[in-house]
C-alpha cells in the first residue's frame, strides 16, 4: 500500500539500465571472454529463455487476464470495445519488456562476474563491487540463502498455479475429481518427472523439454490462428503492439494516485513482485545458457524475442476470447470467473477438435511444469554448491523434491491466496 510507487520506478529503471548496457561501449563485451563461443544454437537458446521465464504462468493467464481486465478495467467502464483494447494493453504491460528487463539485468550481472571475472556462478558474485572479499564469507552466504528462498517460493507460485490448471483440465476432459488430494498427487508425480530431467542434466533434460514446449506450443498457436478468428488475431496483434508502444510511458509510470483502489496492488504490483521473486532463478538460468554472447546480443535478444512471442500468444488466445465475447458468440467470462484455471479449456470448446486441443494443452502445462521445476532445481543447486555447474546427483534430487514440497504445502495451507 505504501511502496507501490517504488516498484513502478524500480522496474522502469531496470529497463532503461538494461538498454544502456546494450547501446553503450559495454555492449561489445563478450560473456566469457573475447574467444568464447555460444554453447547452444539461437533456436535452443530462445526456447530455454521462454520456457524458463514465462512457462506455466502464460498458459494460466493468457486467456483469463485479458477477460478480467475487460470486465473490470482500472479506468472507464467494462465490457466495451475500449475496455477490450485496454485489457490487451494492460496484459502486455504485465508480461512485456519490464519483466524481461528484470531477468536481463540479474542474468547479465551473474554471467559477467562468473564468466569474465572467474567468480562462482552464484548470486553473491553480483555484490562483489560493494562487498569485495566479504562475498566469500557470511554476508555472501546470507545473500545466497535469500536467493534460494526467493527462488523456492517464486517457483512454488507458478508450480501451484500449474497443478491447479492440470487438475482442472483433467476434470474438464475426463471428469476426474478436481480436489486438493488430486492436486497433491499431481505435484508428486510431476516433481518425480522433473527429478528425472534434473538428473539427466542441462543438455539432455532442460534443453530437450524446452524445445518440446516450443514445438507443442507452436502447434496450438497455429491451430488457433487457422481455425480461430485469423484476421482479427493478426489485426489485433499489430494494433496491440502499437497501443503498447504508444502508451508505454503512461502505462509504465501509472500509480493509481488519483483513484485510490486496490486494483494496482492486486495486478501490477503483484506481477512486479512475482517477476522480481523469480529473478534469481531465471537470471541465473539465463546466465548459465548465455556464455559466448555479446552483451548487446544478450540484452536485445532476452528483452525482445520472448516479449514478442509472449505478445503473440496472448493476442491469439486472449484476443480470441475477447472476440467471442464482443461478438456474443460464447460466454467465456462466466466460466473463467467460476474457475480461472479452466479458461484455456473453455476457449478451445468453441473451436473444432476441442478434446484433442484440450489434451494437448494439458500436456503442455505438464511439460512447462517439469521444465520450470528442473531448471529451478539446477539453479538452487548451483546456489547451494558455491556456484559449481556440476554437483552431486543426490543434491539435485533433494532440491527438485523440495520445490514440489513447498508448492504442495502452500496449496494445502491456503490454496490460490497462499500462492
Residue ranges and their predicted role:
Residues 89-100, 265-278, 364-365:
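Individual transmembrane alpha-helix segments
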Residues 13-21, 54-58, 93-164, 172-198, ...:
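Helix-loop-helix module between adjacent transmembrane segments
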Residues 42, 78-87, 135-145, 179-184, ...:
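Membrane-interface alpha-helices at helix entry/exit sites of multi-pass transporters
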Residues 1-83, 199, 222, 226:
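N-terminal alpha-helical transmembrane segments of multi-pass membrane transport
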Residues 296, 308-312, 358-379, 383-417:
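C-terminal transmembrane helix pair
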Amino acid at each position: 500500500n505504501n511502496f507501490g510507487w517504488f516498484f513502478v520506478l524500480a522496474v522502469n529503471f531496470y529497463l532503461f539500465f538494461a538498454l544502456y548496457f546494450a547501446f553503450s561501449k559495454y555492449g561489445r563485451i563478450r560473456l566469457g571472454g573475447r574467444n568464447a563461443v555460444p554453447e547452444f544454437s539461437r533456436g535452443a537458446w530462445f526456447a530455454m529463455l521462454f520456457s524458463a521465464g514465462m512457462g506455466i504462468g502464460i498458459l494460466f493467464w493468457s486467456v483469463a487476464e485479458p477477460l478480467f481486465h475487460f470486465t473490470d478495467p482500472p479506468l472507464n467502464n467494462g465490457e466495451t470495445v475500449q475496455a477490450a483494447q485496454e485489457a490487451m494493453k494492460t496484459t502486455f504491460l504485465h508480461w512485456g519488456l519490464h519483466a524481461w528487463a528484470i531477468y536481463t539485468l540479474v542474468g547479465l550481472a551473474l554471467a559477467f562476474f562468473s564468466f569474465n571475472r572467474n567468480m562462482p556462478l552464484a548470486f553473491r558474485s553480483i555484490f562483489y563491487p560493494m562487498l569485495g572479499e566479504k562475498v566469500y564469507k557470511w554476508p555472501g552466504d546470507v545473500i545466497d540463502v535469500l536467493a534460494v528462498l526467493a527462488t523456492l517460493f517464486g517457483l512454488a507460485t507458478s508450480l501451484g498455479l500449474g497443478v491447479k490448471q492440470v487438475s482442472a483440465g483433467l476434470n474438464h476432459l475426463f471428469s476426474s475429481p478436481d480436489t486438493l488430494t488430486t492436486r497433491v498427487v499431481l505435484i508428486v508425480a510431476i516433481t518425480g518427472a522433473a527429478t528425472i530431467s534434473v538428473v539427466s542434466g542441462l543438455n539432455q533434460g532442460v534443453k530437450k523439454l524446452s524445445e518440446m514446449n516450443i514445438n507443442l506450443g507452436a502447434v496450438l498457436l497455429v491451430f488457433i490462428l487457422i481455425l480461430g478468428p485469423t484476421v482479427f488475431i493478426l489485426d489485433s496483434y499489430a494494433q496491440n503492439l502499437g497501443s503498447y508502444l504508444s502508451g508505454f510511458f503512461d502505462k509504465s509510470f501509472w500509480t493509481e494516485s488519483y483513484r485510490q483502489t486496490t486494483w494496482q496492488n492486486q495486478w501490477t504490483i503483484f506481477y512486479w513482485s512475482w517477476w522480481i521473486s523469480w529473478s534469481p532463478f531465471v537470471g541465473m538460468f539465463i546466465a548459465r545458457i548465455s556464455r559466448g554472447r555479446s552483451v548487446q546480443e544478450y540484452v536485445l535478444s532476452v528483452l525482445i524475442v520472448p516479449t514478442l512471442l509472449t505478445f503473440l500468444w496472448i493476442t491469439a488466445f486472449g484476443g480470441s476470447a475477447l472476440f467471442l465475447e464482443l461478438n456474443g458468440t460464447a460466454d467465456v467470462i462466466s466460466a473463467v470467473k467460476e474457475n480461472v484455471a479452466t479458461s484455456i479449456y473453455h476457449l478451445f470448446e468453441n473451436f473444432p477438435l476441442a478434446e484433442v486441443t484440450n489434451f494437448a494443452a494439458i500436456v503442455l502445462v505438464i511439460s512447462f511444469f517439469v521444465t520450470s521445476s528442473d531448471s529451478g532445481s539446477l539453479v538452487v543447486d548451483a546456489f547451494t554448491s558455491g556456484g559449481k555447474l556440476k554437483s552431486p546427483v543426490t543434491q539435485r534430487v533433494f532440491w527438485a523434491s523440495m520445490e514440489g514440497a513447498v508448492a504442495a504445502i502452500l496449496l494445502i495451507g491456503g490454496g490460490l491466496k497462499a500462492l
